[in-house]
């Protein structure tokens, strides 16, 4: 029963994603390309944040003399 509820929620969220981004008008192969590009850009943004955020935080803390 819980699995069905989770599946319904995921299906509902996917349906909302399709409607909000207007992907329902695209062919399946076009939708796959769009989703691939979106996942790639999101992955690069997360990776860049993971790599560079600590350096920026340390620079800010040193600027405000909170860390020596």
Swiss-Prot record:
Top-level taxon in the UniProt lineage: Eukaryota
Designated name of the protein: Serine palmitoyltransferase small subunit A
TM region positions: 10-26, 32-54
Topology, Lumenal side: 27-31
Membrane topology: Multi-pass membrane protein
Compartment(s) where it occurs, according to its Swiss-Prot or TrEMBL record: Endoplasmic reticulum membrane
Family: Belongs to the SPTSS family. SPTSSA subfamily.
Gene: sptssa
Site label Within the serine palmitoyltransferase (SPT) complex, defines the length of the acyl chain-binding pocket, determining the acyl-CoA substrate preference, positions: 25
A Pfam family matched in the record: SPT_ssu-like
Keywords, sorted A to Z: Endoplasmic reticulum, Lipid metabolism, Membrane, Sphingolipid metabolism, Transmembrane, Transmembrane helix
Ranges facing Cytoplasmic side: 1-9, 55-68
Gene Ontology biological process terms, A to Z: ceramide biosynthetic process
Function of the protein: Component of the serine palmitoyltransferase multisubunit enzyme (SPT) that catalyzes the initial and rate-limiting step in sphingolipid biosynthesis by condensing L-serine and activated acyl-CoA (most commonly palmitoyl-CoA) to form long-chain bases. The SPT complex is composed of SPTLC1, SPTLC2 or SPTLC3 and SPTSSA or SPTSSB. Within this complex, the heterodimer consisting of SPTLC1 and SPTLC2/SPTLC3 forms the catalytic core. Within the SPT complex, SPTSSA stimulates the catalytic activity and plays a role in substrate specificity, which depends upon the overall complex composition.
